[in-house]
Amino acid sequence: VWLAAVSLVAASCGKGESGKIDRRAVVERHRVVTDSTNRVSPAQVGNGDFAFGVDVTGLQTFVPFNTMSNWSWHSFPLPDGVKVEDYTGVLVDTYGKKIPYNLFDPGKPEISQWLAENPHRFNLGRIGLQMTKADGSVVKADDLTETHQEIDLWKGIIYSSFKLDGEKVEVTTACAPDQDAIGVTVKSPLVKQGRIGVFFDFPYPHTKQFQTYLG
């Protein structure tokens, strides 16, 4: 009986060897499409070591999403008069033995807190569109109409489009596969009119925990 069962399984497996799947079709089946910005779950491009989050404009225009890399680490200076060597751990009774653990030491709060907070990841920077309306005022998120965004998961490209004062704006966002860099194209009559530009912001790191945005 067992030999017959094994033979049957082997025969079944053999028939499936020639089967193929359309990997691109499977991936594109999960293409991400949205018409608004999710403030806690942005669209992203990246390469495994670097990630750039965007809002519905294809950049970080209205929401300060993070730009993160595996090498983006930061440490604040040590408090005055404090050294790392001052921390020796906290002795904890473990089955009758005193074992040092890396826990917060109430007797040495400054160095304990510093070690808990440093080093920490930080936001490399923010890149967004600087846009003005026909009357010269600064564009707000509510001023955009017909917003649409798609993430092509197969190509790793984000396509965003919207209208401002009736003029269409198309933004394409991609990430380099072998370096921490993004490439962006902006197509719109508003560019020639000088009503669309780019701004950069470099937030300073902070030590707040469980924050959506770093810096």
Predicted regions and their residues:
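Beta-sandwich/jelly-roll carbohydrate-recognition scaffolds of carbohydrate-active enzymes
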Residues: 18-215
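C-terminal motif of bacterial Sec signal peptides marking the signal peptidase cleavage site
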Residues: 10-12
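Glycine/threonine-rich ATP-lid/beta-loop region of ATP-binding domains
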Residues: 14-16
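Sec-dependent signal peptide recognition
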Residues: 1-3
